């Protein structure tokens, strides 16, 4: 498997030489560290237990770690009550650890355009019969892409999350592409949810890989979404995940199935599983049931049952677009089905991502992400 460093070197070379030309298609596992040698991993800061997440400091980028993302999904209704989903994600990838701080004016000038950090932004709008997605790439440079602290801002060109304070909220989110765009207001007063063990989120049964991970699953969203030139007033609920690590996947893991579910009893459920590259079966799972007051229940892997019940073929590949999610000890028995089964992200890093409907012991809405298929 192509190693991350060489893969990102290729991406960075194309950016340096050809500006915003799109990189060649890669899979998510290549970018997130599977297949790397231990010596390569040791060049970056490891994820370790006991490091407390602090806010607003941890809203910022963590360049000593290899990968990171700011990941928003929203389930919305337009003025006629029609459901739709919006996704915005900004990824950060590092091809090498940051260089030492500049020692003088000449060093400052040299490092302004020399960076080991690359940003990739994805944006999408999904309805029952349409799915539009687009992406942008840029090196980390103040006039192009980055993360600001006061006020908080994550941006790549004119795709921007902009807060009025150093916290994530209140904020505006703007992205525009040829076939779609959105301008949204985001507010939340709920405490952040630290996933795993106080933000230390294990990604394998043996504990070899982990990330720092927190969420805000209780966001009020309003604004405008434009699709094929028609602008709609929308409102609904959103969810942001913040995650960073130096290796998300083992070489033996091929991808994941991830669900962000908003249930009818006013709780939110995050549940995900990682799959073995040889068998395609789940090798590790995790879940947390969350309340708006900041409390939550961590659910051990042995209590989580995920079963794909319907497949959708897209461009010769099958994607599981309907699932049974069962957590008997929490009286949760759900059928999770895609609002639009054809919501594959046809980008340089392809994956499936789209809004879902929930039926069963609870009703609700949410988002699903499928990688490695």
Each language-model region and where it sits:
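Targeting-peptide/extracellular-domain and disordered-appendage signature
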Residues: 2-6, 14-373
């Amino acid at each position: 498997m192509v190693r991350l460093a060489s893969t990102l070197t290729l991406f960075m070379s194309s950016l340096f030489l050809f500006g915003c030309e799109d990189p060649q298609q890669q899979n998510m596992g290549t970018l997130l560290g599977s297949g790397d040698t231990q010596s390569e991993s040791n060049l970056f800061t490891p994820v370790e237990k006991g490091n407390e997440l602090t806010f607003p400091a941890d809203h910022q980028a963590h360049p000593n770690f290899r990968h990171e993302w700011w990941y928003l999904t929203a389930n919305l209704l337009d003025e006629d009550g029609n459901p739709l989903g919006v996704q915005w994600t900004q990824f950060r990838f590092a091809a090498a650890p940051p260089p030492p701080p500049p020692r003088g004016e000449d060093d400052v000038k040299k490092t302004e355009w020399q960076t080991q950090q690359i940003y990739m932004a994805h944006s999408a709008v999904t309805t029952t019969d349409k799915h539009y997605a687009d992406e942008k790439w840029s090196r980390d440079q103040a006039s192009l892409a980055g993360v600001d602290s006061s006020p908080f801002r994550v941006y790549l060109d004119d795709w921007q999350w902009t807060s009025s304070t150093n916290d994530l909220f209140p904020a505006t989110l703007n992205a525009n592409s040829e076939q779609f765009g959105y301008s949204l207001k985001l507010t939340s007063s709920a405490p952040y949810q630290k996933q795993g063990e106080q933000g230390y989120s294990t990604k394998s049964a043996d504990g070899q890989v982990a990330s720092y991970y927190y969420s805000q699953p209780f966001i009020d969203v309003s604004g405008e979404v434009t699709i094929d030139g028609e602008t709609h007033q929308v409102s609904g609920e959103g969810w942001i995940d913040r995650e960073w690590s130096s290796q998300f996947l083992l070489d033996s893991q091929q991808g994941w199935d991830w669900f962000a579910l908003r249930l009818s009893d006013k709780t939110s459920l995050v549940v995900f599983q990682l799959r073995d590259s040889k068998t395609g079966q789940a090798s590790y799972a995790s879940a947390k049931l969350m309340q708006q007051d900041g409390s939550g229940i961590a659910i051990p892997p042995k209590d989580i049952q995920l079963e794909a019940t319907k497949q959708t073929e897209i461009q010769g590949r099958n994607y599981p677009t309907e699932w049974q999610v069962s957590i008997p000890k929490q009286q949760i028995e759900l059928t999770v089905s895609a609002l639009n089964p054809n919501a594959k992200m046809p980008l340089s890093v392809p994956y499936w991502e789209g809004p879902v409907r929930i039926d069963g012991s609870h009703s609700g809405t949410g988002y699903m992400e499928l990688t490695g298929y």
